[in-house]
A protein has these predicted regions:
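Single-stranded RNA-binding regions, centering on S1/OB-family and related RNA-binding modules
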Residues: 1-209
Length: 209
């Protein structure tokens, strides 16, 4: 398989330049000269050769590398709470905000199975062999507190991952685990919520509150 997915940064939002126009849409080019199609349904009448367009690159339902101006709910190397919209014997399919294409969550990447209509916290990665975007519920390889990249009083992105008697376990900046104690919560929250917060303290053993 050609390595276009590596050059085009599959799974990420990026700015590409209009290289040429076809009957099917616009061909967008990156700095390496790699091209990807932006289908007509995402093309504006004002787009012209040389214009720069912010797009998300992925494989469509026919396994073609394409671009879209849709804004995904998750990108490569990030976590999000996504709803299961369908299932089959191979896995589940998640709504990730891309029209006409659901995000695949293979059975091997699930923990305890999933139910249609329920939302689950997942990480998005690009498969090294196929170049496709894939979801996983197994977060341990990606979320850790070995090397802390935040500091006290820093503003951070928070995803509520689970609830305990003392508070909520949260994922910070899609990188670290943290704890929000119930006496530090001043608004209703539930598992799957994304919000902004601040780091209160970091303990000697790298626990983040």
């Amino acid at each position: 398989m050609p390595n276009n997915y590596k050059e085009m940064k599959v799974g990420q939002i990026q700015t590409l330049k209009v290289a040429r126009i076809s009957d099917f849409g616009l061909y967008l080019s990156d700095e390496e000269g790699q091209e990807v199609l932006l289908p007509n349904r995402f093309v504006s009448l004002t787009n012209a050769i040389g214009d720069e367009i912010e797009v998300f690159v992925y494989h469509d339902s026919e396994d073609r590398l394409v671009a879209t101006t849709d804004r995904p709910l998750i990108t490569e190397g990030r976590v999000a709470s996504l709803k299961v919209v369908d299932k089959n014997i191979h896995g589940a399919f998640l709504d990730w905000g891309i029209s006409g294409k659901d995000l695949f969550l293979p059975n091997r990447n699930q923990q305890g199975g999933v139910l249609a209509g329920r939302s689950y916290v997942v990480w998005l990665y690009v498969d090294n062999i196929t170049g496709r975007c894939v979801a996983t519920m197994k977060l341990k390889p990606f979320i850790d507190n070995d090397i802390i990249t935040v500091k006290p009083r820093q503003k951070v992105d928070i995803l509520i991952a689970s609830e305990s008697p003392i508070g909520y376990r949260a994922i910070i900046n899609s990188r670290h685990w943290g704890m929000i104690y119930k006496n530090q919560i001043f608004r209703p929250v539930r598992v799957g919520d994304s919000l902004e917060g601040w780091v209160r303290r970091i303990t000697d053993d790298n626990r983040i509150d």
